Amino acid sequence: MHVLRTHLAGDLGKETAGQTVTLTGWVSRRRDHGGVIFIDLRDSSGLVQVVFRENDVAEQAHHLRSEFCIKVTGEVEARPEGSENPNLASGAIEVNVTDLEILNEAAPLPFQIDDVSQGGEVGEETRLKYRYLDLRRPNQGAALRLRSQANKAARNVLDSHDFVEIETPTLTRSTPEGARDFLVPARLKPGSWYALPQSPQLFKQLLMVAGMERYYQIARCYRDEDFRADRQPEFTQLDIEMSFVDQDDVIALAEEIVSSLWKLIGYEIPTPIPRMTYADAMRLYGSDKPDLRFDIKIVECTDFFKNTTFRVFQNEYVGAVVMDGGASQPRRQLDAWQEWAKQRGAKGLAYILVGENGELTGPVSKNITDEERAGIAAHVGAKPGDCIFFAAGETKSSRALLGAARNEIAKKLDLIKEGDWAFTWVVDAPLFEPSSDATASGDVALGHSKWTAVHHAFTSPKPEWLDSFDENPGEATAYAYDIVCNGNEIGGGSIRIHRRDVQERVFKVMGITEDEAREKFGFLLDAFAFGAPPHGGIAFGWDRIVSLLGGFSSIRDVIAFPKSGGGVDPLTDAPAPIPLEQRRETGVDFKPKKKTDESAV
């Protein structure tokens, strides 16, 4: 239904020639050709060229500037032969304007908004400060429309399987889930605080106890994390939970959803999507989210060098990756690799160059034995002209360095082609990890022991570990699954714990006392006592998925009003101080009374 206009710009074509139309929109570009004025008029559907030839209306059009909001009436005409624009949907026609109304003028722009200038030269702070202008750019507006299409596609799949869309609270109590909470003061209960949810995890499990069986929600989530590249303090996930299912059931549904999303951009995902274990992902790719668009694998060399005299390789782990044709790199490039490794916390990146005649050169080749020199190229699959990069030391960090090196090699060799997609599931991750590893990576280690949950505290052990996970926490595997696309984790889930005794044992491994468990998670433990069904689910990182679908380099491009670095909103200048009166009213400075006896608060 159109009130001020009869058509959208994108609706006009040769079939509308001869019709009188009324359009509304913004002046995208203005060109003056000998008294005839051409305007590219933009609305939400696209662009159309409108022409001002008549004296009065042309005189009025002389006052138009970029981003004036206008209304025009005129006749649709075929463009003169040779002046068609094949790059424009409406490029075969133009509108000969007979009436012009300026709905609103525009001040001088902080940056240009047109089809040619798409934002690369404009600083991000400026773009976000004037986000309402930035979103007028075709690419930016298209990102939000793509997001809406993705929402619809996912809902269609879930609705076809009888899922129920349910909203869960955004004001709840603080229940640690692996990051810091955003807290909201409770004005009516001074000294008490709500927390914004890091995820709907506990509520969706309670919905399974409630018998809803199939739930989903496009949920807003909040995590008060130290700023990391391309993270947002508030983000969106497609949250799903199902009762009476196993891992295969959840994965099958997830693949149906992902397939429907990639069909939006014309790509058919081959299903079933391959699976690999977490152990294989770390061993072969040095990452639990491997990019499989190129076939470079890490080769284990620990056993090969088990009797080495080279002290650097006398370590718990030695591994290698091969750079095809890398022996031809100049010395400055090999030195640059060392700086690259040091920036990642390593001492360097050892290497061997395999000459065209098979002769080995480079620092490592001088320090290994003749037997090792004779066999290393064959062991790692290197041929004449290749470069072998090594990492040695602690297993996890060495593999991570080699994993990063394989990604860097792929970039330098241009192995990743536009339009390539590679999906995999990573399954059988550890149930627990050392708390020190979690904190070192910037996460919050839930609990007070040397072990914390890898995913979250509500992930079930795999069936074979159900009776013994607390006897050997470091070896226990989780009934969990992550989906990876082009080296990005786009979703993760697990089969959940549904028995109170198992949940209490997990808390115990993590050093959460009975009293603390009762205080923070008592409502969940109580619910498990009332016939909680087996259940599992998955959550998709919606911002990341839409950015991949649209080919955007940052999730900020697919969020209507994102935060910049450090969680700051340049548009509204949030976060901001609040007045003293508001501080008093909300009770943020309330100080609990000191305890005078056991019952005092």
Curated annotation (Swiss-Prot):
Its EC number is 6.1.1.23. The keyword Nucleotide-binding applies. Coiled coil: none annotated. Residues 568-601 are annotated as: Disordered. It catalyses: tRNA(Asx) + L-aspartate + ATP = L-aspartyl-tRNA(Asx) + AMP + diphosphate. Homodimer. Residues 201-204 are annotated as: Aspartate. GO terms for biological process: aspartyl-tRNA aminoacylation. Keywords: Aminoacyl-tRNA synthetase, ATP-binding, Cytoplasm, Ligase, Nucleotide-binding, Protein biosynthesis. It is found in: Cytoplasm. Its main location: cytoplasm. One of its GO terms (cellular component) is cytoplasm. Belongs to the class-II aminoacyl-tRNA synthetase family. Type 1 subfamily. One of its GO terms (molecular function) is aspartate-tRNA(Asn) ligase activity. This is Aspartate--tRNA(Asp/Asn) ligase. InterPro entries: Aa-tRNA-synt_II, aa-tRNA-synth_II, aa-tRNA-synth_II/BPL/LPL, Asp-tRNA-ligase_1, Asp-tRNA-ligase_1_N, Asp/Asn-tRNA-synth_IIb, AspRS_core, GAD-like_sf. PANTHER family: ASPARTATE--TRNA LIGASE, MITOCHONDRIAL, ASPARTYL/LYSYL-TRNA SYNTHETASE. The gene is aspS. Aspartyl-tRNA synthetase with relaxed tRNA specificity since it is able to aspartylate not only its cognate tRNA(Asp) but also tRNA(Asn). Reaction proceeds in two steps: L-aspartate is first activated by ATP to form Asp-AMP and then transferred to the acceptor end of tRNA(Asp/Asn). Residues 581-601 have a biased composition (Basic and acidic residues).
